[in-house]
Amino acid sequence: PVLNAWKKEAAAVRPAQAPPLPPGVEMMAVCTSSPAAQPLVLEGMTHLLTFGDMKAYRKFSAALKLDPDCLMAHWGVCMSLMAAGPEFQKERVESMKSMKELALHPAFPEHERAYADALAVLLMDGPEEARKAWKTLYETWPRDPYAPLFYAMLLRDGFDDRGKPGEGQEEAVRLVDEVLKKRPGSQAALFMRALLDEVAPVIPPETVETARRAVAANPQSSSAHHLLGHFLFRTGDYRGASAAFKKSEDLCVNWEKSEKVPRALNDAYFRSAIYRAVSEFCAGR
């Protein structure tokens, strides 16, 4: 797309004031002509890290309506639609093209261009090479609250048959713990820290508490309630798990109505409904 006149100034001068961020969403500068687009992009990034791809897509799309040349919003559309169906193919390709064109322009911050590069590496070269790109990104911009979490997501390699975490798993835990020391209220970091223990042989009480903190960071997050339900189920609290999945269901329905989204695009609702049914069965109800 043709760059607007403001773009030459955007790298040096950010919008002076943006609307307040929702609970649990961390601040990061976003190059945009619209102060209102910045929190939308950051909400979208938080949704990506908490497994809410369609919600993320809606936020990034809303940001693009305010600023069609927002590089990070195009990046977000590409990220959130990676696993989407063929009905999103055209939009995914168009945003990828726009992201690549904008990332070549020196008016955009190097930080944002690095995000575009890391995504390109992921798509073209796979997760192993992408890990290197994300590591460089988070090491180069240590104040970025999101880069270490995307890196941690790629590092995850689970546990072996004896319950020992893999090297990537241990490094991911270390990274997320570092983020939480600096930003204890980060919903994305709390969610990621709990998620890292999801496939552990035994769920310790500390992990359940971390999942509860992720819910407290943003009580309107259906993903956080769903994740809490997983841990309550794993620890034998089937009634508590059912209640958590029901809360996730309700929030999914509320989101459908407020965003006018068809249920077919709300896969989180179906996941929560299925897990709640299993929890109810295990609870003997």
Where are these regions (language model features)?
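Residue at a conserved register position within TPR or TPR-like alpha-solenoid repeats
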Residues: 47, 81, 121, 155, ...
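Structural motif corresponding to the intra-repeat A-B loop/turn of tetratricopeptide repeats
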Residues: 50-51, 84, 124-125, 158, ...
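Alpha-helical segment of the N-proximal tetratricopeptide repeat
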Residues: 33-62, 66, 116-126
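Alpha-helical junction/boundary sensor with strong preference for TPR arrays
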Residues: 67, 81-84, 102-106, 141, ...
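Residue-level recognition of tetratricopeptide repeat
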Residues: 36, 69-71, 110, 143-147, ...
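TPR-repeat structural position
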Residues: 53-54, 89, 127, 169, ...
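"A position-specific structural signal for the A-helix of alpha-solenoid helical repeats
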Residues: 42, 76, 112, 116-123, ...
